[in-house]
């Protein structure tokens, strides 16, 4: 794990100190011997990489993974944000307090949901090695609810199953998970699934190859979302009890809002939470999912820094980035996220008519060529879990290879945020009204 510094990105460079992970004593592999894999994103050799790409690879090899397989051939194309995303993923996978069988069950559930063949193959083996029964793995592979789960696993299964299939979490399920694993456990479960959603998107868009001689395991499911079909979020379950707390970190005041995650005052925070809050207050504030993120100061800080990069330092035009964000918020039915970014989308040049069409589940008319390329790319992913050759070529032609990755990471980051907000039932802002209605089918 690297030492975190609050300002990760200045002038497009990664500025972070390197410290050996506490659980690593072996020398990191030689990066010059690294062999990356990919299809649409052609693998790079270490000597061909930019300084920022080499930094990302060095961090991966020195960290818990000690390698760069899977999504990193893709994320390497935008290394500043890819480096932060990898650290968030490392916190969720390796530095959580969750039991290993629960961690691997959540990962294969997410891989099954997104039909990510490489991810499934890798973590199916890890699940079995960590004590997940073969019958449970097989049930998840075929889209069935497993029987014979231990209570502590069933609790986690219910949370992720509800979140992926309804895009919401019931009161009973939230309470059961919180009582067993605490608020940090809830954050880590949702964050873990969200991270592997980004992993799935990276792998599937790249068409990442399976190991030689290994056929894909997962068959298409007739109904991968049994509750809502291929639709968006169901209505928010239960009675909402939003709360708002105003507090101060030193001389600077801040506000935190939430529902199931009751906002903390500064005095209620642990030293690690205070440190994270001090950084946030000095930068972009404590709005949105921050009240949830602070429950895990390690993973939450990396997610905060990843969000800073996504929000302010991407290479794609703001209009196309905001289009990606509101499409993601619409898919997840994330009311707070939608309201925050619908205005930003209009300010960036997307017309009110197009934003309204997306809110209502209609394909916007009169899109420009660049808007249509991005719209097709994001909606096709949410509908099919893939990107066709034509769609991939069109969006790459508009934004370039790095731009494609910036769109993937933007969708992936705001998907994580949407999942966290929906789990909390984060209330919309004062004086605002929810705009998104339940949709029974995806955007055309």
Language-model-detected regions and their locations in the chain:
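Hydrophobic alpha-helical segments
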Residues: 18-444
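Positively charged n-region of N-terminal signal peptides that target proteins for export
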Residues: 1-4
């Amino acid at each position: 794990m690297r030492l975190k510094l609050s300002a990760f990105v200045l002038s497009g460079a990664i500025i972070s100190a390197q410290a050996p992970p506490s659980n690593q004593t072996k020398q990191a592999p030689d990066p010059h011997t690294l062999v990356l894999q990919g299809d649409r994103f052609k693998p790079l050799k270490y000597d061909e990489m930019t300084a920022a790409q080499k930094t990302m690879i060095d961090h991966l090899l020195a960290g818990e993974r000690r390698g760069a397989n899977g999504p990193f051939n893709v994320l390497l194309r935008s290394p500043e944000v890819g480096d932060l995303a990898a650290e968030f993923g490392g916190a969720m996978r390796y530095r959580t307090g969750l039991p290993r069988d629960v961690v691997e069950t959540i990962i294969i559930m997410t891989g099954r949901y997104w039909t990510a063949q490489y991810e499934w193959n890798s973590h199916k083996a890890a699940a079995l090695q960590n004590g997940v029964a073969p019958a449970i793995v097989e049930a998840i592979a075929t889209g069935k609810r497993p029987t014979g789960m231990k209570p502590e696993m069933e609790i986690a299964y219910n949370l992720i199953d509800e979140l992926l299939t309804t895009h919401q979490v019931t009161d009973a399920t939230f309470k059961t998970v919180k009582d067993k694993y605490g608020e940090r456990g809830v954050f880590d479960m949702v964050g873990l699934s969200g991270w592997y959603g980004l992993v799935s998107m990276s792998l599937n868009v790249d068409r990442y190859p399976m190991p030689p001689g290994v056929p894909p395991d997962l068959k298409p499911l007739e109904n991968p979302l049994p509750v809502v079909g291929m639709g968006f979020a169901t209505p928010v379950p239960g009675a909402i009890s939003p709360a708002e707390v105003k507090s101060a970190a030193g001389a600077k005041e801040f506000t935190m809002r939430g529902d199931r995650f009751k906002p903390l005052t500064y005095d209620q925070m642990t030293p690690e939470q205070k440190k994270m809050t001090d950084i946030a207050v000095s930068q972009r504030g404590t709005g949105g999912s921050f009240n949830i993120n602070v429950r895990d100061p390690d993973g939450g800080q990396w997610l905060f820094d990843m969000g800073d990069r996504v929000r302010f330092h991407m290479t794609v035009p703001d209009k196309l980035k905001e289009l990606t964000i509101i499409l993601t918020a619409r898919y997840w039915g994330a009311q707070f996220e939608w309201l925050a970014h619908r205005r930003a989308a209009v300010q960036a040049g997307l017309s009110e008519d197009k934003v309204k069409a997306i809110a209502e589940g209609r394909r916007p008319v009169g899109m420009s060529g660049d808007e249509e390329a991005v719209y097709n790319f994001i909606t096709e992913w949410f509908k099919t879990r893939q990107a066709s050759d034509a769609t991939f070529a069109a969006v790459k032609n508009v934004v370039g290879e790095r731009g494609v990755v910036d769109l993937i990471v933007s969708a992936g980051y705001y998907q994580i945020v949407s999942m966290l907000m929906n789990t909390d039932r984060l209330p919309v802002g004062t004086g605002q009204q929810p705009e998104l209605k339940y949709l029974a089918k995806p955007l055309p």
